[in-house]
Amino acid sequence: DVYKRQLHYYEDIEYSKPDGNLQKAVTSLLGIRNYSIVSTDAVYRQTLCKEQLWRDKGAVGVDMETSAIFSVSKYLGLKAVAMLMVSDIHPIDSNSAKWEWKMTNEMRYNLVDQAVAFAKAINNTK
């Protein structure tokens, strides 16, 4: 079956996770919030049903890279954490507002500034 999930680093894995210490540090140092997300390799394949299933599992967002970064980092014995930003809101039912891109340049620059500040802070603790 072509659509069968391919597991290259683990025989069975449902969730990939950031390093706990880095996650605590980034939320503490930057005062940001921590939420679960879904990481998928299916570009533009979300359906209303999938969106609801993911939300029912506690996910507040969808991205395409985080799972791979966390899985490979763990496999290689490296520590990893992700800082993500909400850029849009997908509809969860046919009555929801139409999808619209909401990210601004100011939001992008702010995220980069926060990431640099975090990298400097953890580098100074070594």
Question: Where are the predicted features?
Answer:
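A C-terminal functional module that forms or caps the active site or interfaces directly
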Residues: 49-89
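Generic non-transmembrane alpha-helical segments
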Residues: 21-31, 72, 114-122
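Short, small-residue-biased leader/transition segments that mark boundaries at the very start
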Residues: 2-3
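Conserved active-site and cofactor/substrate-binding residues in soluble primary-metabolism enzymes
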Residues: 17, 21-24, 49, 64-68, ...
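Active-site rim beta-loop-alpha module in soluble metabolic enzymes
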Residues: 14-57
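A short glycine/serine-rich beta->alpha loop
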Residues: 12, 59, 102
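His/Asp/Glu-rich mid-to-C-terminal helical/loop segments that flank catalytic regions of hydrolases
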Residues: 90-126
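Alpha-helical transmembrane segments in inner-membrane proteins
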Residues: 8-9
